[in-house]
């Protein structure tokens, strides 16, 4: 993956849902990033060009005596239409090929395998490179709840973004769900995220113009109908948001918004749920409810959960606690093995 300009959280959310907005119930939604980011710019619709009517020349009448008799011949046999299946499958193959992710084997039971991974950024002097993650090696098993602790600027969110395929790896390897992220193109990373990831942000990042139902439906539409096992209304009932399902984000409390964001993340049944400070913007009661909810989700859906946080109280639900300082893992402890 090539280095790209750092995107805002809202732009990352937009990248994840822009391809499937046409499937959402809100017909009035204007699918442009500028409108989503509350830009004042207005786009003008181009007027259709006027098409001049062309008069067709009248056919000249032919007198009967001018028509010469012709010899009767046998009608040719109709040619069998050529089969188009081969061409269609080739065309489909060309369209899908750029999005097909590479595959490598992992140890049995492992969902994340990181080996000597580095992340460099350019400093104020463009010639100088600064390491914000250094020589990170890590293995995480399916179904673990992993808490990543560390002070601000230690590299916690960078690690989460690299695992999520939102940032490029400078050196080393990062294999998630058999997909080597360092070898992926931008298109392949999009497929990787659609198939494997759910992301919960600190500031919820719900689309303000859509109801809770439609915010969740955006994520559900990333997977084919035949692969959907969760119903939005049933999931909403489990997450205690059924009463606000058709309300808009501005009508919700912080805790309700975070529950909708979690529902949006897990509706497509991802293998990995990434949470960036999931309780950071909540009061203590709402935070406790979200902690209990994440624990219940892990138990019921067997999803691996990675949480970046400053809140050490979250460690009580962890299987694994990772501490990061100055871009290095200083501690990686399995505190509660999976049963």
Swiss-Prot record:
GO molecular function annotations of the record: ATP binding; ATP hydrolysis activity
Organism of derivation: Mycoplasma pneumoniae (strain ATCC 29342 / M129 / Subtype 1) (Mycoplasmoides pneumoniae)
Highest taxon of source: Bacteria
Compositionally biased intervals (Basic and acidic residues): 54-68
Family: Belongs to the ABC transporter superfamily.
UniProt domain ABC transporter: residue ranges: 112-338
Region (Disordered): 41-87
Keyword Transport recorded: yes
Biased composition (Basic residues): 42-53, 74-83
Sites where the protein binds ATP: 150-157
Assigned keywords, A-Z: ATP-binding, Nucleotide-binding, Transport
The UniProt record lists the keyword Nucleotide-binding: yes
Protein name stated in the entry: Putative ABC transporter ATP-binding protein MG467 homolog
Pfam families membership: ABC_tran (PF00005)
């Amino acid at each position: 993956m090539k280095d790209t300009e750092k995107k805002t959280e809202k732009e990352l959310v937009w990248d994840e849902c822009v391809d499937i907005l046409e499937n959402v119930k809100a017909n009035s939604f204007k699918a442009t990033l500028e409108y989503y980011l509350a830009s004042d710019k207005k786009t003008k619709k181009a007027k259709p060009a006027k098409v001049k009517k062309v008069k067709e020349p009248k056919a000249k009448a032919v007198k009967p005596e001018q028509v010469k008799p012709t010899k009767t011949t046998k009608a040719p046999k109709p040619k069998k239409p050529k089969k188009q299946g081969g061409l269609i499958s080739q065309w489909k193959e060309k369209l899908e090929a750029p999005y097909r992710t590479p595959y490598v084997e992992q140890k049995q039971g492992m969902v994340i395998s990181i080996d000597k991974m580095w992340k460099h950024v350019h400093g104020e002097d463009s010639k100088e490179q600064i390491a914000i993650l250094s020589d990170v090696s890590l293995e995480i098993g399916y179904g673990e709840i992993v808490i990543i602790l560390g002070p601000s600027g230690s590299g916690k969110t960078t690690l989460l973004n690299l695992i999520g395929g939102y940032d490029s790896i400078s050196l080393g390897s990062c294999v998630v769900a058999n997909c080597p992220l360092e070898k992926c193109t931008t298109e392949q990373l999009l497929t990787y995220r659609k198939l494997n990831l759910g992301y919960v942000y600190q500031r919820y990042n719900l689309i303000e113009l859509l109801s809770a139902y439609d915010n969740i439906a955006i994520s559900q539409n990333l997977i084919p109908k035949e692969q959907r096992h969760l119903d939005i209304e049933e999931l909403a009932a489990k997450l205690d948001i059924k009463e606000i399902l058709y309300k808009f984000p501005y009508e919700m409390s912080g805790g309700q918004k975070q529950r909708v964001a979690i529902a949006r993340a897990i509706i497509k049944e991802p293998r990995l749920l990434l949470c960036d400070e999931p309780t950071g913007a909540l009061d203590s009661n709402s935070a406790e409810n979200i902690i209990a909810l994440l624990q219940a989700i892990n138990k019921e859906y067997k999803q691996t959960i990675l949480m970046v946080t400053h809140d050490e109280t979250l460690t009580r639900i962890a299987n694994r606690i990772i501490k990061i300082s100055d871009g290095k893992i200083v501690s990686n402890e399995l505190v509660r093995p999976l049963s």
